[in-house]
Amino acid sequence: MSIRERLLATVSRYIAAYNEFDPSAMKTVRTVSCLTHGIAPTCKFTQSVEEHTKHMMLSRGVFRSVNASIVDDGTTVVDEGSRKVVVKVKLRCETIVGPYENEAMFIMAMDEEGTLVDGIFQFLDTACFRQFQGRLEEAHVSRD
């Protein structure tokens, strides 16, 4: 298998684990030192594997199902030398406040073998995310 094929296979395994929305599944495709970075101006964060696990556990109370898929529109970029892949991702989720859809760009850095994710940079469409946050806040206020 070429390095390009390995990198793309790792991205596919990551997306499959993401769809399980299970921290244990996510850990199987990430290095122990993997960091997740939110890089949108209004949604900046950096999380270790353990911090990401805690975030996922809290989010399970909001998200009932998660479906992420790679948008195959020619935007995928594979840099074999740096072991990085850039993919456009479509997110469709069922949540406690109804459907949530968004698009994101994931920049994924892999380990030397190209089989584990060593860093993830996520750029979400923040307008969609803010609308979703507003719906969550409205639901929370109406419960109080």
UniProtKB/Swiss-Prot annotation:
Pathway entry: Secondary metabolite biosynthesis; terpenoid biosynthesis
Any GO BP annotation: terpenoid biosynthetic process
InterPro entries the record matches: Fungal_Meroterpenoid_Isomerase
Signal sequence, renumbered to the chain: none
Disruption of the gene: reported phenotype: Leads to a complete loss of austinoid production.
Further comment found in the protein's record: In A.calidoustus, the austinoid gene cluster lies on a contiguous DNA region, while clusters from E.nidulans and P.brasilianum are split in their respective genomes. Genetic rearrangements provoked variability among the clusters and E.nidulans produces the least number of austionoid derivatives with the end products austinol and dehydroaustinol, while P.brasilianum can produce until acetoxydehydroaustin, and A.calidoustus produces the highest number of identified derivatives.
Assembly behavior: Homodimer.
Record function comment: Part of the gene cluster that mediates the biosynthesis of calidodehydroaustin, a fungal meroterpenoid. The first step of the pathway is the synthesis of 3,5-dimethylorsellinic acid by the polyketide synthase ausA. 3,5-dimethylorsellinic acid is then prenylated by the polyprenyl transferase ausN. Further epoxidation by the FAD-dependent monooxygenase ausM and cyclization by the probable terpene cyclase ausL lead to the formation of protoaustinoid A.
PANTHER family, per database record: AUSTINOID BIOSYNTHESIS CLUSTERS PROTEIN F-RELATED, AUSTINOL SYNTHESIS PROTEIN F-RELATED
Similarity section: Belongs to the trt14 isomerase family.
Protein name (record): Austinoid biosynthesis cluster protein S
Gene source species: Aspergillus calidoustus
Gene designation: ausS
